[in-house]
Curated annotation (Swiss-Prot):
UniProt entry keywords in alphabetical sequence: Cytoplasm, Ribosome biogenesis
Source organism of this protein record: Cupriavidus necator (strain ATCC 17699 / DSM 428 / KCTC 22496 / NCIMB 10442 / H16 / Stanier 337)
Superkingdom, natural source: Bacteria
NCBIfam families the UniProt entry points to: PRK00092.2-1 (NF000929)
Its biological purpose: Required for maturation of 30S ribosomal subunits.
CDD domains: YlxS_C (cd01734)
Compartment annotation: Cytoplasm
Record GO cellular component, one term: cytosol
InterPro entries recorded: Ribosome_maturation_RimP (IPR003728), RimP_C (IPR028998), RimP_C_sf (IPR036847), RimP_N (IPR028989), RimP_N_sf (IPR035956)
Protein name, per record: Ribosome maturation factor RimP
Statement: the UniProt record of this protein carries the keyword Lipoprotein: no
Any Gene Ontology biological process: translation
Gene name in the database record: rimP
Pfam families: DUF150_C, RimP_N
Length: 162
């Protein structure tokens, strides 16, 4: 079984989702997890770390060190479900190919529309001539992240504990 599949299967059985997996030099394995309903606390990271350590031993996974973390305030957007969950939030999107000479966009995500497998995501942004709407598919994205919203008064971003 592929490492990402092994981790994803383990996490889904525990009620978490795999956001990102990184293999860093010197055997470091970084796993970013989330729980859509509640977000991630340090106790969640500890629990997942213990479980993955056990699974990796049983499955004979080669690694030196394991780090388990929340995706952070600037959470990456990887799957269609991420765009659905964070519709209405501000995001920074870099496309694989330029649209009108531009690859980088920052704006408000709109919920995906269209038939299954052909969904288009909307991003409202400030264009050269005023407000504009960019429509793109998940496959058009090189990378996308939420724009961190830091509110020192204690209000939280929808769907997150962070």
């Amino acid at each position: 079984m592929h490492l990402a599949d092994l981790i994803e299967t383990t996490l889904s059985g525990m009620g978490y989702e795999l956001v990102e997996l990184e293999r860093a030099p010197a055997g470091l394995l970084r796993v970013y997890i989330d729980q859509p309903e509640t977000g991630i606390a340090i106790e969640d990271c500890e629990k997942v770390s213990r479980q993955l350590t056990h699974v990796f031993t049983v499955e004979n996974v080669d690694y030196e060190r394991l780090e388990v973390s929340s995706p952070g305030l600037d959470r990456p957007l990887k799957k269609l479900a991420d765009y659905v969950r964070f519709a209405g939030e501000e995001a920074r999107v870099t496309l694989r190919l330029p649209v009108n000479g531009q690859k980088n966009f920052t704006g408000i995500l709109r919920e995906p529309t269209g038939a299954a497998g052909e969904e288009k995501i909307g991003l409202e942004f400030e264009g050269k001539d005023g407000p504009a709407l960019l429509e793109f598919a998940v496959s058009d994205v090189d990378k996308a992240r939420l724009v961190p919203v830091i509110d020192f008064k204690g209000n939280q971003r929808k769907g997150n504990k962070q």
